[in-house]
């Protein structure tokens, strides 16, 4: 079973990866196949804390990340502008080179833009103004910016900080985690709930 690795830094936004993890770990729909295993990675194996106060003990650190995995998902939060976040750059470079699924939501999408990873693909973030305010000269992709909750271009998926459900849907599509019908049904269930308006 292939792994999907969630990159978590301190003060990560716990809600941004919750739906993806549940769909991958339990199946997109009840009784659906479970083709992936969720794993977490951080700079070290010391516990990382979320904005909501959850503490996670990472499965991997920078020294023991496996070569064989299906996707690298960068969960947003308050530490993507820190010096320690720079240590994640080689992981993203290798994942893109190896044609893995790579996702970044909220400030993690800004991190991807800061390092030039989004210059040649359609992408989104927390508005183009927010993105430009935080990225440097390596970002030249503003003509590829799309004002949507989440955008998938090939194997690269980005989302703004309120697009966790759309981010989940696009990652499930990129990973071919289930049929299109099951992915859409799951998305609409989480979006609309038991009592759609």
Would you name each region that the model predicts?
Residues 2-5, 12-13, 19, 26-44, ...:
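Active-site-adjacent pocket-lining segments in enzyme domains
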């Amino acid at each position: 079973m292939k792994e999907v690795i969630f990159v978590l830094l301190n003060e990560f936004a716990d809600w941004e990866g919750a739906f993806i993890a549940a769909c991958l770990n339990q199946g997109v729909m009840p009784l659906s196949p479970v083709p992936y295993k969720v794993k977490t990675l951080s700079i070290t194996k010391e516990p990382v804390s979320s904005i909501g106060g959850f503490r996670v003990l990472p499965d991997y650190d920078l020294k023991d990340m496996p070569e064989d995995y299906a996707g690298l998902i960068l969960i947003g939060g308050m530490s993507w502008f820190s010096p320690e976040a720079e240590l994640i750059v080689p992981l993203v470079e290798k994942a893109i080179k190896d044609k893995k699924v790579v996702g970044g939501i909220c400030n993690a999408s800004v991190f991807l833009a800061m390092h030039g990873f989004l210059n040649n693909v359609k992408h989104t973030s927390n508005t183009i103004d927010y993105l430009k305010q935080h990225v440097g000269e390596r970002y030249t992709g503003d003509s590829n910016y799309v004002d949507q909750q989440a955008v998938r271009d090939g194997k690269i998926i980005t989302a703004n900080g309120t697009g966790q459900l759309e981010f989940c849907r696009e990652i499930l599509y990129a990973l071919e985690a289930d049929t299109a019908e099951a992915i859409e049904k799951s998305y609409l269930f989480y979006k609309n709930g038991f009592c759609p308006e």
